């Protein structure tokens, strides 16, 4: 078992990473302030892991709240179901919420914790690779709006993040690939040697080789913890964690939440960010192609939806959270391992990026 720390002063918390942590009270008891706990999960994860988690919560009064599964349910009506359950069972301010599931559950449970009686404790127990390496760490919580992804929410830090790598054994291959989009992101934005490591270990990652998976999670969480510790509320460097996300969120919104998995949209969006960085002269063609090949090896789509026009992208990107004073800012790369956030680019470069034939670009790279 490995422990990392997110250093935020009085809001600091540990990240526990290991196998078979879910049923062990040692990782939960120090972070539960009262006797009452509400476990927020979904219809897919609860049958697999709720019973095991309950073993770690013996001695506490537990309210399970099982929600429908999927990005399409990350909205007000589903959030209301959490509040309904908490109020019906008369949970008070000493209640601890535990998010047992992927990114959707973690985001909604965290937002519910931020809002319920103006703030109660919560613990993240992420069960997908994407949530383990990204969304469970850093305190971003919230829900989607029909006009934009994650536009309603709060920064609210958990008491702890408990990552049980055994939960990945039941993860569908499509979800595993989606999570790898966020793992690869860390190499692209701040850790070029990690890119080489991922190239060397991608087959082992896809095969869920335990020591390799644990190292990938630890390196990803360590990178996320460093960035969050330096910029909790995304006023500066934390925005670099959104590489590929502005393009990706546009894909998710246009296609309908849940049609493309978040990581899939980020994968295609990252290809677009690589292409734009190349067009600006910041990435060589070889660097761009290296990035695309790695994303493709991870099983990710490297071509955005063919039916999406440049105008479709611009419509959705106009409501991105990184827009300031009406100016779109993007996360781009000035070399692999060096991300920048900038709104200082020629409009025609963005337009050309949105109109690029990504199918032809992918075909040009050939098969692995």
UniProtKB/Swiss-Prot annotation:
Pfam short name (any one): DHQ_synthase
CDD domains xrefs: DHQS
Binding site for NAD(+): 69-74, 103-107, 127-128, 140, 149
Catalyzed chemical reaction(s): 7-phospho-2-dehydro-3-deoxy-D-arabino-heptonate = 3-dehydroquinate + phosphate
Subcellular location as annotated: Cytoplasm
Entry-linked SUPFAM superfamilies: Dehydroquinate synthase-like
Keyword Cytoplasm: yes
InterPro entries: Dehydroquinate_synthase, DHQ_synth_AroB, DHQ_synth_fam, DHQS/DOIS_N, DHQS_C
UniProt-listed Enzyme Commission number(s): 4.2.3.4
A cellular component annotation (GO) from this entry: cytoplasm
Superkingdom assignment: Bacteria
Cofactor: Co(2+); Zn(2+); NAD(+)
GO molecular function, one term: metal ion binding
Example GO BP: amino acid biosynthetic process
Gene3D superfamilies, per the entry: 3.40.50.1970, Dehydroquinate synthase-like - alpha domain
Keywords associated with the record: Amino-acid biosynthesis, Aromatic amino acid biosynthesis, Cobalt, Cytoplasm, Lyase, Metal-binding, NAD, Nucleotide-binding, Zinc
Cofactor: binding comment: Binds 1 divalent metal cation per subunit. Can use either Co(2+) or Zn(2+).
Binding residues for Zn(2+): 182, 245, 262
Function: Catalyzes the conversion of 3-deoxy-D-arabino-heptulosonate 7-phosphate (DAHP) to dehydroquinate (DHQ).
Similarity-based family: Belongs to the sugar phosphate cyclases superfamily. Dehydroquinate synthase family.
Name used for this protein in its record: 3-dehydroquinate synthase
Species assigned in the record: Pseudomonas aeruginosa (strain UCBPP-PA14)
Species classification: Bacteria, Pseudomonadati, Pseudomonadota, Gammaproteobacteria, Pseudomonadales
Name of the gene encoding the protein in the UniProt record: aroB
């Amino acid at each position: 078992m490995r422990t990392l720390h997110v250093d935020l002063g009085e809001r600091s918390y540990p990240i526990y990473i290991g196998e078979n942590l879910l049923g062990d009270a040692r990782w939960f008891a120090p972070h539960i302030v009262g006797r009452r706990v509400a476990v927020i999960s979904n219809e897919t994860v609860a049958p697999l892991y709720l019973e095991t988690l309950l073993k770690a919560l013996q001695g506490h009064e537990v309210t399970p709240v099982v929600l429908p599964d999927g990005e399409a349910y990350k909205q007000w009506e589903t959030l209301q179901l959490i509040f309904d359950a908490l109020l019906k069972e008369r949970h008070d301010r000493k209640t601890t919420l535990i998010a047992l599931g992927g990114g959707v559950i973690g985001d909604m449970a965290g937002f519910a914790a931020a809002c319920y009686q103006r703030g109660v404790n919560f613990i993240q127990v992420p069960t997908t690779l994407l949530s383990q390496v990204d969304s469970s760490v850093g305190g971003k919580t919230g829900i989607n709006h029909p006009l934009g992804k994650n536009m309603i929410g709060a920064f609210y830090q958990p008491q702890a993040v408990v990552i049980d790598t055994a939960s990945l054994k039941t993860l569908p291959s499509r979800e595993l690939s989606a999570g790898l989009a966020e793992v690869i992101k860390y190499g692209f934005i701040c850790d070029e040697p990690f890119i080489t490591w991922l190239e060397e270990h991608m087959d082992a990652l896809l095969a869920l080789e335990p020591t390799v998976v644990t190292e990938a999670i630890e390196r990803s969480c360590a990178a996320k913890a460093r960035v969050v510790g330096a910029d909790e509320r995304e006023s500066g460097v934390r925005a670099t964690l959104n590489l590929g996300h502005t393009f990706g969120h546009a894909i998710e919104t246009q296609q309908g939440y849940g049609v493309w998995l978040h990581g899939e949209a980020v994968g295609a969006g990252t290809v677009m960010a690589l292409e734009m960085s190349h067009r600006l002269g910041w990435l060589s063609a070889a660097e761009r192609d290296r990035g695309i090949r790695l994303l493709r090896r991870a099983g990710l789509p490297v071509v955005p939806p063919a039916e999406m026009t440049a105008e479709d992208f611009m419509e959705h990107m106009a409501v991105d959270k990184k827009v300031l004073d009406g100016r779109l800012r993007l996360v781009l790369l000035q070399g692999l391992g060096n991300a920048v956030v900038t709104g200082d680019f020629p409009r025609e470069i963005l337009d050309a990026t949105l109109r690029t034939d990504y199918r032809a670009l992918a075909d040009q790279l050939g098969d692995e």
